[in-house]
Amino acid sequence: NNREVNKKMNRVCEVLGIEKPIIQGAMSWITNAEFVAAVSNAGGLGILGPNAGQKDITSDPDETAERMRREIQKTRELTDKPFAVTLIGSGNSTSVFTMKILDVVIEEKVPVVLINSYGFPGMLGIYKALLKPLKDNNIKMVVRSILPSVEDAKVVEEQGADVYVATGFDEGGTLPPRMIGSFNILPMIKDAINIPICLAGGIA
């Protein structure tokens, strides 16, 4: 079976249970259940980004979380493949919105979570707050730092993450504050950690 061979040959595929080492961008407002299921059904990892499936914003953390729950359930109706939900960490504390969605992710037994972070040292408290409960519930964790560094990658690995995503300045959306290209940031980090590493930014 070629699909099983591909999984065994690629550590990202093996860890996340996907067929192709492709992780869909967790774009705010753009993703929905149909989008995510299509990516997962094609062998990649589809991700429900912030405000997935929504056309308007709510200031109520509980309603935000319940909207994500409904989108998770819709996704499950469209695919039996692994998919992920995004959790956002910023500043030096977790927001009530993030923690409410964390609860939903655990309750719904989502197979994978993508944590969008802003890099160590300010993220250490957030890593501890998010990664431990996810690990305790056997949810795979992909951490994408917008300020990737060897130090951050090591901390992420120590806190139990399964995959680290390094983002270069080539990317679209929220740009890293340092102007280091994607293919320059990768060799800085890949030999410093043992968990699989993915690269984001300017790759097509």
Question: What function would you assign to each model-found segment?
Answer:
Residues 5-198:
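Active-site entrance/lid segments in N-terminal catalytic domains of soluble metabolic enzymes
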